[in-house]
């Protein structure tokens, strides 16, 4: 987002600012839930082979833990990279 656009948001009426904040919050919640669901589906599919017991065995538990850690590290790295690209794009405007 460029600085002119942010300046325009500051000029909005208070009611519109509240609506924008609410929309942004809803989008953040949606994205968080989507990421969580993707993580659960991917790690469960990759790590759990059968339903032998109610609980995960040690191997499945270790696999799920590693999978989740990898997924979160990757997601954080992608987010940082997008932030770097956005910051670079904003400075070239």
From Swiss-Prot:
GO terms for cellular component: mitochondrial inner membrane. Disulfide bonds join 43-67, 47-63. Keywords: Chaperone, Disulfide bond, Membrane, Metal-binding, Mitochondrion, Mitochondrion inner membrane, Protein transport, Translocation, Transport, Zinc. One of its GO terms (biological process) is protein transport. InterPro entries: Mito_inner_translocase_sub, Tim10-like, Tim10-like_dom_sf. It is found in: Mitochondrion inner membrane. It is a peripheral membrane protein. GO terms for molecular function: metal ion binding. A motif (Twin CX3C motif) lies at residues 43-67. The twin CX3C motif contains 4 conserved Cys residues that form 2 disulfide bonds in the mitochondrial intermembrane space. However, during the transit of TIM9 from cytoplasm into mitochondrion, the Cys residues probably coordinate zinc, thereby preventing folding and allowing its transfer across mitochondrial outer membrane. Mitochondrial intermembrane chaperone that participates in the import and insertion of multi-pass transmembrane proteins into the mitochondrial inner membrane. May also be required for the transfer of beta-barrel precursors from the TOM complex to the sorting and assembly machinery (SAM complex) of the outer membrane. Acts as a chaperone-like protein that protects the hydrophobic precursors from aggregation and guide them through the mitochondrial intermembrane space. Belongs to the small Tim family. Heterohexamer; composed of 3 copies of TIM9 and 3 copies of TIM10, named soluble 70 kDa complex. The complex associates with the TIM22 component of the TIM22 complex. Interacts with multi-pass transmembrane proteins in transit. This is Mitochondrial import inner membrane translocase subunit Tim9. It comes from Mesembryanthemum crystallinum.
């Amino acid at each position: 987002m460029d600085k002119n656009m942010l300046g325009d948001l500051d000029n909005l009426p208070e009611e519109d600012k509240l609506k924008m904040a609410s929309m942004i919050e809803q989008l953040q919640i949606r994205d968080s839930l989507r990421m969580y669901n993707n993580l659960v589906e991917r790690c469960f599919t990759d790590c759990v082979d059968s339903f032998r017991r109610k609980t995960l065995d040690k191997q499945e538990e270790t696999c799920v833990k590693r999978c989740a850690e990898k997924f979160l590290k990757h997601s954080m790295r992608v987010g940082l990279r997008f932030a770097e690209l956005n910051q670079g794009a904003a400075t070239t405007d």
